[in-house]
UniProtKB/Swiss-Prot annotation:
EC numbers for this chain: 3.2.1.17
Descriptive protein name: Lysozyme g
Location of the active site: E73, D86
Annotated disulfide bonds: C4-C60, C18-C29
Amino acid sequence: RTDCYGNVNRIDTTGASCKTAKPEGLSYCGVSASKKIAERDLQAMDRYKTIIKKVGEKLCVEPAVIAGIISRESHAGKVLKNGWGDRGNGFGLMQVDKRSHKPQGTWNGEVHITQGTTILINFIKTIQKKFPSWTKDQQLKGGISAYNAGAGNVRSYARMDIGTTHDDYANDVVARAQYYKQHGY
């Protein structure tokens, strides 16, 4: 089972903002931009597919969601230097922030992906408590947003991404995850 926290295909999304799409060299924004970026990352992502699926099954999170976060955070490792990104604070494929967590494992290994996914699950659980009337799928989206900007930043369903990087984090990750789900994740 990988659907304990909702199903990414049931989540509405506006996709990438122009602030996210433009630096990628795209002249368009939205879901199609997210899917294009995810497609560009697919070859690199496929190197980690087995581990991503194993962790997803172990922790009952859709592997596609993990892949969506990895694409957004590190372009499947392509932008990292010795496993580090984000001015030396973010570690690994999932960019675990060393200011909030002690990074575990190698930057691209199972231990790291397990740590990042566990951090995501903890945010989903916090959002479940904060917004008990939301559907499971809405809570999943809220947890994805919180992975970027913290649970305190999630104030309403419609505006959860305001305050995330480029104000589009969960919407972009969800659209990328939908792409990865179509590609066997």
